[in-house]
Amino acid sequence: GMWYGKGPGVDRCGDVFRHANAAGTSKFGGVLAVAGDDHAARSSTVAHQTEHLFKAVMMPVLAPSGVQDYLDLGMHGWAMSRYSGCWVAFKAVADTIESSASVYIDPHRVNITQPDYALPPGGLNIRWPDDRLVQEERLLHHKLYAALAYARANRLNQLVIDSPNPRLGIITCGKSYLDVRQAFDDLGIDDKLAAEIGIRLYKVGMVWPLESEGVRHFAEG
């Protein structure tokens, strides 16, 4: 399934998200909640940002950087939702929604890797009957960690530029990743030069919960 709403819609649906995420998703289903974030309120009643609202209801949050990412991370979002039992949030900003690009549309180009996470007895998907406190325990102790395992196994967060002698590390996500790449181009810094002068660039696809192993590896050096 796919839910879509702008910032005010996310505000109004917080109760829905909390209950649905606690209940879970089907192992043959999955839900992607697409939030149309209009930071400058160009076509909205208020300026808004939604990541903190999804975090409050404990939904993993994906932040695609461009049109190609919308397709690729979208496929991963549904797969992660099926695997972890979580509803998965997907941040869609106005600047990207109103743009165009040439993209690869073959859905089979996205290879899904099953994590090695040890699932609890009964799995993580929706079931009935299901006590509300058991739902909360499953979400806090298993479902979010399963989402982290999925992100790690499928490299949703990537070290895009590495350097043998790193001096400066830049962590970025969403559209700001492309802004950083544009700034590099404006400065005449390609990937080879960035590595030579000691720059590391890390692109975060899942901004919450943040997968710590990849960040720790990035920060070493």
Locate predicted features:
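Flexible, low-complexity linker and terminal segments
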Residues: P64-G221
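Thiamine diphosphate
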Residues: G1-R82, V93
